[in-house]
Each structure stands twice: as C-alpha cells, then as structure tokens.
Amino acid sequence: MRCSPKRSLTAVIAASFLLLLLLLLLHRGSWQDPQEVQFRDLPSDAVLKILKQGSLHILQDTDNLCALHNISYHLLAGSPLPHKKFLAVGLSSVRRPRGYYLPDTLQSLFKQSSEEELQEMVVVVHLADADPIWNAQVAADISHRFAHHILLGRLVLIHTPHEFYPTLEGLKRNYNDPEERVKFRSKQNVDYAFLFTFAANLSSYYLMIEDDVWSAKSFFTAIRKAVASQEGSNWATLEFSKLGYIGKLYRSSDLPRLARFLLLFYQEMPCDWLLTHFRLLLTQKDVIRFKPSLFQHMGLYSSFQGTVNRLEDDEFQADAMDLPDNPPAALFTNMVVFENYEPSKAYSTARGYFWGKNPAVGSIFSIVFHQPARVTRVRVQTGSSERPGDFLHAGVLELGRGRRADGRDCSVYTTVGTFEKGNLEWRGLEKGMPNPVECVRIRVTQSQSEWLIIQSIGIWTAGT
C-alpha cells in the first residue's frame, strides 16, 4: 500500500518531531546527567540505545502510519451507530493456548451496567488472531450469546486483515526478550493501534481493558463522575485499575495519535511501557488513578504461551456505587509525614496513601468538615501488602462537635469504634449521633515501633 507524497512527508515530519520530543524529555537538563531521565520505567541507556538504533527505522516505518488512513476492517458482527456515545470500551482478543474468557468479560460489562448506562456505551472487540477460522468461530459464538446487544449497536466485533500489519519477522530483541515474546508484544501493539483507530469516532471517551476481566457494578457511572472531577485539567490518561493496561481511559480525540505512536514504536517495547511514555509526552507527569479499582483480572492463563498468571488487584471493589461521599474537609495530623505521603492521599479517591512516622499514644489524624454533616458510616483501612507491619495496631474512631476557632479540631469527641487488625467499619452511626458532626478523628491508643499507613478513609453521609 502506498501513500501520497504529501501524506508521506507529513508522516516523516511528525515522526521527526516525536523523536525530538523524546530526546528532550530524556535529557532536558544535561547530556551528562542520567538522573534527569523522565522515563522512570525504562533505564536511560536502554532508551538511548533504542532511539539511536531506531532512528533509521522510524523514517522507514512511516509507511506503516499511512496504513492507519486506509484500513479496510472486516465487520464480523454488529455495526456502529451513527451518533457518538459517551464511552467506548475496547478490547483485543487472540486465541489463548489455555482458557477462553471473552464471553465472561462481555457478560460482566453488560450485566454490571444499567439500561441507561448501556445507552451511552459501545463495546468494540478486535478479534486479532492470525487464524481466520478461530476468529469466525468466536464471532459466531459471541453473536449467539449477545445477539440483543449486537442488534442494539452496543457490541461490535471487528478484524484487521493481515496485509495491513507491518512485518513481525526479524524484529529487534530489545531487553534480550526471546524472539517469540518480541513478536507477540509487537503484534499486540499493532492490534491496539488498529483498534484505537477504529474506535476514535465512536465516543467522547475510550476505555481500554483486556479480554479477561471482571467489571464493578455501575463502573460507567463511576467513570463519568471521575471525568467530571477532572474538568478543566489537561489529563492524558485516567486509570481505574492497578494492573497493566486494564482500565485506562483516554479522550477519544487522542486516539489517532496514540495509534500512530504505538505503530511507530511497535517493535521497541511492551504496550504498557509505550502507554506510560505517551502520557509523559502529553505532559501528564503524575499517574491519576482512582480508588477503588473498577476492574479485576480474572484469567488464570495468559494469552502468551498459556503461562499461569495470577495477577489480582487488591483495590478492586465489586460495587462501584458503594462509594463514600467524603465531604469537603481539611485534614490534620500531629504525626511526622514521610516524604510526600500527605494526609489528603488517604481521604482522596486518587492514587496514594498517608504514611506517618512513629505513631505514639495520643497521635491523631483529624478530618474537619467545611460544613457539618450527618455521618452514617465510616470505613478506614490501614497497612499495605508491601509494608504489612505498618498498620494501626491499636486505635479508636471518634466523632466530634464544636469546631474550634482555628478550624483544626473539635472541642468534644465521642468514641464510636475500635480498630481490629488495622481496619474499621461502622454503620448506622446516625443512630447514636443523630445531629450533624464537624470532625472525624483517628486516635492512636498504643505506641508502636512500625510507622502507620492509612490506605483509605471512606465517610458516608445521610441524604447523599
């Protein structure tokens, strides 16, 4: 397939500009200072090696970018509706040596969504196996199981013919990966690039998942709320899972350049690494990840050689609507905060947690509401799998009234619960304290040598 001279020139210019951006990000301060490298997931010398070796093939592979403008997809089932939805959910699927999880994944997506949510959502499955017989069999199976959703335009199955793929033979073996792994991950990058291109005009936002995940109930509404909370910010990626590229959300307007990015560097590194670099190139330095996670990995066997893969997200919550209200508040503690693990990270739905040094008898963590609230339920989780000893060994939860003049505390507190093995959850608190409260406080009742991690604090209020 050939491109016009004008299109080829545009592709070369775009590739050169992208390469320049990568070099600037890698060494924005000094060519001699490797600490300035922003690609934290990749050693700087490895990236430089890739760029030096790849500078030639970048110009050669611009023909691959032209393919994105001329793809003739095979519609295996369903057809996109003419009007845009709020959300497109995209996943790519190939034959696994062991296990077949696609039907369960689709069932979870549809079952965990209300009728109103489904009206604003479309699911696109890219059946990307090289075996056309397998693709046809899966398409027939899915069409039979989900005929209702296909007829309503909620589910579309596509395939990209082999002739549109770049070469998958003789690829560079970066990181000493075996040849078969390099071929697998390189094809996976191209699979996603073609999927992104197809989905770019279907919706306002695009959610990336895998073909072996469970979805939380009402994940759609949780995502809509998360997007609204980021209004006015120039985010590139929002994340709703800790695992790989499960639960990554993009603006659909960014999908064409993300597709070009994956296709340009398809043989260099795995997809999740490229997605991280894409986020950095779009100047989003920090990960924006929401808690709890909305998607859980369920597949036991990976799509690469059928190896056992027991990955699980320990922050997954099955009901996305069972989310705390967490009224606007100021947070205070008399514990010494370690580095940037601020109190706000325990109270926010975003990524991170509070980490305090040397909790002693009388150490406190206070939440002072901007406005009084009727608290009905409180849930606090401390400790972490990485630091299992850094949980609250002994402590109580208190509700307070009579906010002091300095706005940092309340004058009167009532103890409502005791921590058990670092965790606490109490419901029906409005029965004991029917009037609005102004403070919620965690108080340490026994000194401990381990530091204290507060993973999350959830507060539910009446009337919300």
Swiss-Prot record:
<dbReference type="GO" id="GO:0000139">
    <property type="term" value="C:Golgi membrane"/>
</dbReference>
<keyword id="KW-0735">Signal-anchor</keyword>
<feature type="glycosylation site" description="N-linked (GlcNAc...) asparagine">
    <location>
        <position position="70"/>
    </location>
</feature>
<keyword id="KW-0325">Glycoprotein</keyword>
<keyword id="KW-0808">Transferase</keyword>
<dbReference type="GO" id="GO:0008375">
    <property type="term" value="F:acetylglucosaminyltransferase activity"/>
</dbReference>
<feature type="glycosylation site" description="N-linked (GlcNAc...) asparagine">
    <location>
        <position position="201"/>
    </location>
</feature>
<feature type="transmembrane region" description="Helical; Signal-anchor for type II membrane protein">
    <location>
        <begin position="11"/>
        <end position="31"/>
    </location>
</feature>
<keyword id="KW-0333">Golgi apparatus</keyword>
<dbReference type="GO" id="GO:0047253">
    <property type="term" value="F:alpha-1,6-mannosylglycoprotein 4-beta-N-acetylglucosaminyltransferase activity"/>
</dbReference>
<comment type="pathway">
    <text>Protein modification; protein glycosylation.</text>
</comment>
<feature type="topological domain" description="Cytoplasmic">
    <location>
        <begin position="1"/>
        <end position="10"/>
    </location>
</feature>
<keyword id="KW-0328">Glycosyltransferase</keyword>
<keyword id="KW-1133">Transmembrane helix</keyword>
<dbReference type="InterPro" id="IPR056576">
    <property type="entry name" value="MGAT4_A/B/C_C"/>
</dbReference>
<dbReference type="Pfam" id="PF04666">
    <property type="entry name" value="MGAT4_cons"/>
</dbReference>
<keyword id="KW-0812">Transmembrane</keyword>
<feature type="topological domain" description="Lumenal">
    <location>
        <begin position="32"/>
        <end position="464"/>
    </location>
</feature>
<dbReference type="InterPro" id="IPR006759">
    <property type="entry name" value="Glyco_transf_54"/>
</dbReference>
<comment type="function">
    <text>Glycosyltransferase that catalyzes the transfer of GlcNAc to the Manalpha1-6 arm to form GlcNAcBeta1-4Manalpha1-6 linkage (also named 'GnT-VI' activity). May also participate in the transfer of N-acetylglucosamine (GlcNAc) to the core mannose residues of N-linked glycans by catalyzing the formation of the GlcNAcbeta1-4 branch on the GlcNAcbeta1-2Manalpha1-3 arm of the core structure of N-linked glycans.</text>
</comment>
<keyword id="KW-0472">Membrane</keyword>
<keyword id="KW-0479">Metal-binding</keyword>
<dbReference type="GO" id="GO:0006487">
    <property type="term" value="P:protein N-linked glycosylation"/>
</dbReference>
<dbReference type="Pfam" id="PF23524">
    <property type="entry name" value="MGAT4A_C"/>
</dbReference>
<dbReference type="GO" id="GO:0046872">
    <property type="term" value="F:metal ion binding"/>
</dbReference>
<comment type="similarity">
    <text>Belongs to the glycosyltransferase 54 family.</text>
</comment>
<protein>
    <recommendedName>
        <fullName>Alpha-1,6-mannosyl-glycoprotein 4-beta-N-acetylglucosaminyltransferase</fullName>
        <ecNumber>2.4.1.201</ecNumber>
    </recommendedName>
</protein>
